Each structure stands twice: as structure tokens, then as C-alpha cells.
């Protein structure tokens, strides 16, 4: 199956990003559909990575397209910083209340696999123990977060209890201004061929503590 040129560029860009020996060809953008290129980059969330590789390898692209990439990269820098600061404040509050909290998915990949905020910022995925939902909801509401319109008018304690006992639903979105949090209390769904122990997040924390002590 023939791959579209725009998709091929995306793949080559990622290869170049993760392995500097795979340099992009100088004429890699010849004959492409720039509108389609922008759509592909937006869908796959690698605009900052493409900009970084273009600058590093001094490849010419249309000025208006370059300007849009630069503008978006600046927005990303602000979004990353804002998310990091918000996450630190949330972690501090949860620690004071003895609630185990684990960031995962996007924000974890961002910190461990990418450099200089090159992964596009988005929501903050957080994982807690199911039993801590009532306290977690209270903390988020006190920080100014709101639920979706359908849930906002419900009794919070009752909502937490319903979710604790629910089957098949393991996350809930919360919003505050530019911040969007997906709060999870499990990471495996009933239709999957595997599951995790009820308190597996505590096991993760214990393992992290063990590793920290072994390196101290």
C-alpha cells in the first residue's frame, strides 16, 4: 500500500527526532499539499517536533506555514508550564490529604520521552484509588474545577459513591479555565483480557519509594 507523501514526512520526521543519524532530505517537502500537511501534523500532534527538526537541519518551508508552527510552539511552551505548575499544586494538596496520586499517559510521556516540551500539551491524566474519589472530588471543586454540565448539579458525595460502585466507567473529566483533567480510578476496562488489583496504584508508589531508597 502506497503511503501518502504527507504521512511519509511525518514518519521521517519522527525517525529523525529519535535518531539524529536519520536526517531529513533537503527536498523532502517538494510537491506536498501544505493544507493536508498541516491537517496531518495537527491530528498526530507533532507540530513542535517538525518545527524543531526543520530548524535544526535548516530546511526551507513556506514562511506562512513556518510562522504558524512558531506561533503554536509558543502557545505550547505556555501550556506546558501551566500544566506543570497546576500538577505540582494538585500533588501537594493530595499529599497533605494522604491521597495517592499518579500522573500518567500524556504528561508522563512528555516528561520521559520528549525534551523541551516537544510533545503537544493537552489534558492532564491522573490516577487515584477508587476509594479516594469523594475526597478527590472535594479537593478539585475547592480548586475551582467543575464537572461536565450533566454532572455539575448532582450531589458530589452521591456521585462519588455511584462511580465507586459503577462498572465500565473508570474516568471523569474536570475543567478549570485552560486546564482539563481526566481523573481515572482504573486503567483496564471490562472488555479487555486483563485487569489490575484494586490497590495496584499503592504498589506503584511502594515500588517508587523502594527505588528511591536504593539510589540514595
Residue locations for each model-derived region?
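Conserved NTP-donor binding/palm subdomain of two-metal-ion nucleotidyltransferases/polymerases, i.e.
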Residues: 1-122, 128-216
Amino acid at each position: 500500500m502506497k503511503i501518502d507523501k504527507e504521512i511519509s514526512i511525518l514518519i521521517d520526521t519522527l525517525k529523525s527526532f529519535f535518531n539524529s543519524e536519520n536526517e531529513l532530505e533537503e527536498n523532502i517537502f517538494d510537491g506536498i499539499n501544505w493544507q493536508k500537511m498541516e491537517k496531518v501534523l495537527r491530528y498526530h500532534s507533532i507540530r513542535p517536533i517538525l518545527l524543531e527538526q526543520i530548524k535544526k537541519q535548516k530546511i526551507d518551508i513556506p514562511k506562512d506555514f513556518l510562522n504558524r508552527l512558531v506561533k503554536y510552539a509558543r502557545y505550547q511552551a505556555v501550556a506546558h508550564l501551566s500544566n506543570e505548575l497546576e500538577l505540582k499544586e494538585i500533588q501537594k494538596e493530595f499529599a497533605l490529604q494522604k491521597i495517592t496520586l499518579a500522573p500518567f499517559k500524556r504528561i508522563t510521556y512528555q516528561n520521559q520521552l520528549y525534551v523541551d516540551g516537544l510533545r503537544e500539551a493537552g489534558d492532564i491524566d491522573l490516577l487515584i484509588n477508587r476509594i479516594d474519589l469523594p475526597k478527590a472530588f472535594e479537593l478539585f471543586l475547592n480548586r475551582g474545577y467543575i464537572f461536565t454540565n450533566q454532572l455539575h448539579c448532582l450531589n458530589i458525595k452521591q456521585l462519588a459513591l455511584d462511580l465507586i460502585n459503577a462498572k465500565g466507567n473508570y474516568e471523569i473529566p474536570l475543567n478549570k479555565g485552560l486546564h482539563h483533567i481526566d481523573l481515572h480510578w482504573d486503567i483496564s476496562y471490562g472488555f479487555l483480557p486483563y485487569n489490575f488489583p484494586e490497590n495496584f496504584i499503592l504498589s506503584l508508589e511502594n515500588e517508587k519509594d523502594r527505588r528511591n531508597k536504593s539510589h540514595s
